[in-house]
Every structure is written in structure tokens, then in C-alpha cells.
Amino acid sequence: MSNLKKISDEDRESKFGYVFAVSGPVVTAERMSGSAMYELVRVGYYELVGEIIRLEGDMATIQVYEETSGVTVGDPVLRTGKPLSVELGPGIMGSIFDGIQRPLKDINEMTSSIYIPKGINVPCLSRTQSWSFNPLNVKAGSHITGGDLYGIVHENTLVKHKLMVPPRAKGTVKYIAPSGNYTVDDVILETEFDGEISKFTMLQVWPVRQPRPVTEKLPANHPLLTGQRVLDSLFPCVQGGTTAIPGAFGCGKTVISQSLSKYSNSDVIVYVGCGERGNEMSEVLRDFPELSVEIDGVTESIMKRTALVANTSNMPVAAREASIYTGITLSEYFRDMGYNVSMMADSTSRWAEALREISGRLAEMPADSGYPAYLGARLASFYERAGRVKCLGNPEREGSVSIVGAVSPPGGDFSDPVTSATLGIVQVFWGLDKKLAQRKHFPSINWLISYSKYMRALEDFYDKNFPEFVPMRTKVKEILQEEEDLSEIVQLVGKASLAETDKITLEVAKLLKDDFLQQNSYSAYDRFCPFYKTVGMLKNMIGFYDMARHAVETTAQSENKITWNVIRDSMGQILYQLSSMKFKDPVKDGEPKIKADFDQLYEDMQQAFRNLED
């Protein structure tokens, strides 16, 4: 019996399969038994990157992330045995990747061409650049588990890159590198567990379709301040929240997501341009390095806290699907360091269209509008990776990932499957309105259809810091809603026949719309509105409304009636000051001066109404 061959002696099945059929980005290969779902493969003599998305018998269906022209039947398909993964380590911030994390700048320098050659094999993070590494209080002999911080790399002046033990590793430290300069390939930590020694470099590799583990999810209770008045006051989002911005073409989705990445109170921004125009990504590349943010009195370029994943509309379709996962995995990595990360996905509709195209090539059953039946599940699995969490390992830290997804429904129709599936998942809906955009009212957020489900979660924050804010916001919504109802009557019978209080409502609503909700992203004073300024402006506008109504209601029965016309004629100056509150520049004037000016205006208003009533 002993001379019989064992299976283990035989050569394992070969690492090669062969191309059987090609249909656009979808390639079928034979002799692929033993391969796994979502395994990375190299197709053809160019070694194009692909991923297995279906297995039947020994046939595998592969979606290829590059142009497949020139692939012929019988070409070899090399199995790598690894899933599609991203490299996580120093060097991510400030760089621009394509959908499968190939560094576009390095490729450009290497080939000196504006095109990405086929099957190019470039390391995602530079292997030659050295980073200055400082160990934290971890010594040889100390025990360490997944997620523990063991060192810091000052990636740039804005982002401290904290090095973590990979989530599934554990053991006793045998060696930790002293402070000094190392590349991402140098071993800086060795651990021993059960007699096995593991070596770690600054680089971690993580599969993109798998969420990174956390200790627990926490309730989100801190607002994501965007610097846009209409969003911060009426429809706030939280750090760790999910938001959708649906809107037709030309409504300003991209401007909103760019201003979020410029001015929001996040530590790290990941901007995924997914199937949108290439010019928008180049605009980001051109604008961001010039924009600065002030941290502890030092001005820094915003590009230092931003990573870009560019997958424009002329790049291969299949890579669009990967780009969203690449972006969210990069975000989760920085979240695990204890940062608040915002991820902008512009736009998830193009991602859904990529799913639809691949699904059509696979001859799957189409559902609504030809999208695959699993569209909702895929969207949910992406959005649910957002949230505020307690990170793995020591020291204890909290991080969050907020996702802002732009949706471009065809013809601005919000009943489109992608929009309706997204609205069933996200908690905040900033609906953009074509009519407002045509009236040049930007940001063109329709205050009647938009909503936020985080109001209750944020009440504690407002009570602690801005106690008068919540009742004012409720009143603003009431005024805007009333104005909508009155506008129909006005169109029928004209303004003159309205009650005096209704005239006040109309005028204050006009003031709110023109000078509070509207905001010019391209002006120095208004491109960013800090929250104290938002609250100050609201306080004065609502104060004016309350005082005017009070004056009209108390004198309605008496001899000298105060009507809206009387108020308007005698308070021209105050109305002018109310509508020019937005011109106060937070950078030049500073917080104390703006607050003092707003308080002064409030006192002037009270005095003016006292004089009027006397």
C-alpha cells in the first residue's frame, strides 16, 4: 500500500486557465477549477487585471478592469489566489488613484503619456520614498493585538499617520524599529505567537469588499458642519451619517460635494469621482492645492488631507464598481486611526449603470429600468459601512466615516430606481431643484422636499452650545411652509388683500430665501459660513419677524394701527442691515466682531420697534 501515490504528491492544478470567450469587459475562461469568487486574475499576454464574478463547473466569468481589445480565445489566464485588495500605508494622502488604486501620477511619470498603458504593474504606494517613523510606547516583550497603535509617521503637516497592527494579528513584540527613516517595505515590527514569528511593515493589504472590523458601533451625535447655511441649519448631517444629493444636471451637485470637501469639519476627505466628467476631477486637482485650512494658527493646503479616486466616464466601466469600494476601504483605514472621515461619491448613479452593464453582459434577469435585482442590496452594503465607531485595539479612540453620495437621476426624476433605493437607506436627503437652479438660487436645495432624520440625535449638541437654535429652526420651517401656501393666494388675488401678518410672513420668507438660504460659493465672504454666524443671522431674522408680528397684532384694534407698510417705511435701514448680514467675512472680521455686530443690530431693532409703538 505504501507505494501508492498520495494526492499531495501530485502537482496541484496548474495556475493557468484559458480564455474561452470575450464580450466587452466580461471574459469567460475555462480550466479554472479551484479558483474562488472575487479572486484577482491576470488575463491574456498583457496581464490585464480582472476579478472573478461567477463560477460554473470549471468555467469562470471575469470582469476585467481594463480595455479588453486584443484578448483572443486561448490566451492564458493567471490566477493570483488573492482577492482585489488595496494597499494601506503612508503616501495615500495628497495622491490620486484610479478605480483599482493605481497611482496616476507615478504612471504618468513612468510612461510620460496621458494614457494608462495596458496591464501596467506599478506599486500603489511608492516603495522608494522614506518616511520618518516614531515608535509609541511599545517595547520588546509587550503583548499586542489587532488594531493597537505602535508608531506614528508624520505623513504631512496635517495628517499624523498612525500605524496599526493588522486586525487579525496578535502576539508578543520581539522587535520594534527605533526612530528613523524607513520605506514601506522595511520591517518595523516583529511579533511571536505560538512559536510563529510575524513580520510587519508600514504597509497593510486589505480586500476592498470586506468591511474593516471595529469594536462597536456608536450612536452619532456630533454635526457634520458643511459651511452651507441651508444644510447646517435646516437639514443637518452627523459625523458618521449617510446623505444623498439627488439632482438633475446643472443643479450644483458637484459644487456642493466639493465645498463639503473644502470646508467641512472632517479630518480626512476621500473624494471618489465615479463615472463623472474628467474635467471635474482636474478642477479638484487644480483648486484643492490652492485652498488652505487653518489649524492651530498654521495655514495648510487642503490637498494634504485629501485622497482622490478618479474613475472618469471614459475609463473602463468595470473599474467604476471597484472605485466605490476602494474609496470606502481607504476611508475605513483612516477611521481606524481615530479620524473623522468624509467620503464623497460623485456619482452613485454611474456606479449603478456600471452594475447594469455588467449584469446585462451576464444575461441576468433585469429588474426595474434594466438595473439588476440586487441593486438595493449593493447600495445598502456600501452605505452601511458608514458610521461612528469605537476602533479596535489600544489606546481607545473613536472614528467616523460619513458618506455623501451624489445621485444623478435621468431628467431629474426622483422616482428613478437608484434614487428610490438610495432614499430607503440614507438618513439625510438634500434634494436639488431644477427650478431653483434656473432662478440662479444656489445651493439649489428644495427646502420643502428635503429632510434630515438626525434632528433628534443632534438636540443634545444644540442644547449645550446653541440653546436658542432649535425653536428658531422650527419657526423658519413654518414661515417657509406658510409662504408656499400663501403664494397660491397671492397669484389669484394679489398681495394687497392679504392680512397684515401674512404680509410680514411673505416678506420675512423672501428675506430668508434671498439672504439666508442663498449662498455664493465663489465669494470670499460667503463660500463658508461658520455655525455661529448661521445662528446669529437666524436670530436676527426671526427676531424681526416676532417683533413685527407683535407690533401689528397689539395695535390692530387701536387708533394708530401699525401695518406692514408703516414698518417697511420706517425701518428701511434695519431691513437693509438684515439683508447684508451675510457680507460679514468670518476670516477678516473674526468671531467676536461678527457676534457683537449681530447683537448690536438686535438691540437697534428692539429700539426701533419701541419707538414705533410709542
Curated annotation (Swiss-Prot):
GO cellular component terms given for this protein: proton-transporting V-type ATPase, V1 domain
EC number: 7.1.2.2
Binding site for ATP: G247, A248, F249, G250, C251, G252, K253, T254
Claim: RNA-binding is one of the keywords in the record: no
InterPro entries in UniProt: ATP-synt_VA_C (IPR055190), ATP-synth_a_Xtn (IPR031686), ATP_synth_asu-like_sf (IPR023366), ATPase_a/bsu_AS (IPR020003), ATPase_F1/V1/A1_a/bsu_N (IPR004100), ATPase_F1/V1/A1_a/bsu_N_sf (IPR036121), ATPase_F1/V1/A1_a/bsu_nucl-bd (IPR000194), ATPase_F1/V1_b/a_C (IPR024034)
This protein's record includes keyword Transport: yes
Top-level taxonomic group: Eukaryota
Gene3D superfamilies: 2.40.30.20, 2.40.50.100, Bovine Mitochondrial F1-atpase, Atp Synthase Beta Chain, Chain D, domain 3, P-loop containing nucleotide triphosphate hydrolases
Class of enzymatic activity (EC top level): translocase
SUPFAM superfamilies: C-terminal domain of alpha and beta subunits of F1 ATP synthase (SSF47917), N-terminal domain of alpha and beta subunits of F1 ATP synthase (SSF50615), P-loop containing nucleoside triphosphate hydrolases (SSF52540)
Catalytic activity: ATP + H2O + 4 H(+)(in) = ADP + phosphate + 5 H(+)(out)
Activity regulation remarks: ATP hydrolysis occurs at the interface between the nucleotide-binding domains of subunits A and B. ATP hydrolysis triggers a conformational change in the subunits D and F, which induces a shift of subunit d. The c-ring is subsequently rotated and results in a continuous proton translocation across the membrane.
GO molecular function: ATP binding; ATP hydrolysis activity; proton-transporting ATPase activity, rotational mechanism
Keywords carried by this UniProt record: ATP-binding, Hydrogen ion transport, Ion transport, Nucleotide-binding, Translocase, Transport
GO BP term, pick one: ATP metabolic process
PANTHER family: H(+)-TRANSPORTING TWO-SECTOR ATPASE (PTHR43607:SF1), V-TYPE PROTON ATPASE CATALYTIC SUBUNIT A (PTHR43607)
Subunit-level organization: V-ATPase is a heteromultimeric enzyme made up of two complexes: the ATP-hydrolytic V1 complex and the proton translocation V0 complex. The V1 complex consists of three catalytic AB heterodimers that form a heterohexamer, three peripheral stalks each consisting of EG heterodimers, one central rotor including subunits D and F, and the regulatory subunits C and H. The proton translocation complex V0 consists of the proton transport subunit a, a ring of proteolipid subunits c9c'', rotary subunit d, subunits e and f, and the accessory subunits VhaAC45 and ATP6AP2.
Family membership noted in the UniProt record: Belongs to the ATPase alpha/beta chains family.
Function: Catalytic subunit of the V1 complex of vacuolar(H+)-ATPase (V-ATPase), a multisubunit enzyme composed of a peripheral complex (V1) that hydrolyzes ATP and a membrane integral complex (V0) that translocates protons. V-ATPase is responsible for acidifying and maintaining the pH of intracellular compartments and in some cell types, is targeted to the plasma membrane, where it is responsible for acidifying the extracellular environment.
HAMAP family, A to Z: ATP_synth_A_arch
Name of this chain's protein: V-type proton ATPase catalytic subunit A
Organism whose genome encodes this protein: Anopheles gambiae
Name of encoding gene: Vha68-2
